[in-house]
Amino acid sequence: MAFNWPVFKTRALSSVVFVAVMLVGLMTSPWLFLLLFSVIHWGCWREYQSMMEKIQPAYRDISPFHRYGVIIAGWCMMVFASSDHWKIGNVSFSAIGFWIGLILIFVLPMIEILFSRAMDLKNVRTSALGLLYISLSCSLMVNLRSGWPFIGDFSDELLQPLNSTTATYTGFLVPLIIIASIWINDTMAYIVGSLIGKTPLTAISPKKTWEGTIGGILLSVAVVTLYAAFVIKSSWQHYLAISAISAIAGTFGDLLESKIKRMAGVKDSGSLMPGHGGFLDRFDSLLVAVPFVWLYAVAFM
């Protein structure tokens, strides 16, 4: 695959915008981060439902209560995953998300039975898979940002080790490493694959090559680990592990979404960003990487 400078320029500019938006959400406050991922969650769900309607025509017959109720239920998962320190009156924001979500779990199936044109368990399964694919990942990302200790100014935290005792900032840095690793992997995989890629990775995504995939992962891990070792002079093991998990799992996320698009017969999931398609095209890697990074963070950090 020959290197295409105009395509790369478009992809790079879109990636810069993406990273800038994500950094604003990370740097300002957990509230803004929740708002940002609420928008991402909504966009991913609408594109997911649109593609599922092409793959499974019966899904077009779900009621509006089902269509939007499941998105609200997924958003409640995100609220539940947020910090217990956020309160409305004397009630924690997390508890509000839990109880509204619990009510929806019981109400939505009854609404599906009463108002859908045809009750089809496949439709319920499709929505349940959407909750697992989209809502769970967004919830865990919010949990990493808001549910973990975070104090201090972000500019100081970028220059302190991950296991620092002088500032508890895991809630900022872990999401940052995920986003940076995926962005570097995506960019480097395209460059390496364009320059030296010859061996197709899979028929699901014909333009991807083994050379580009391996090169992207290795360069992503190298950049993040070297940053830890030489810029902030930190213990680099956590950085290496999180960047490797993000890059590898993110690649599988990219392939998964490519498979869904192929089944739906569409080139892009939407038209959010030039060179990157829709919400799912932009966040496919993140959706698969986050649960694995979250498990690592809970187990080892």
Short names for language-model regions:
Residues 264-285:
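Interfacial loop-to-transmembrane junctions
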Residues 216, 282-286, 301:
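A short, conserved beta-to-alpha structural element at the edge of catalytic cores
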Residues 105-106, 270, 287-288:
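Hydrophobic alpha-helical transmembrane segments of integral membrane proteins
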Residues 1-209, 213-245:
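Membrane-embedded alpha-helical bundles of polytopic integral membrane proteins
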Residues 295-301:
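Juxtamembrane boundary at the C-terminal end of a transmembrane helix
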Residues 261, 286-288, 292-293:
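C-terminal transmembrane helix pair
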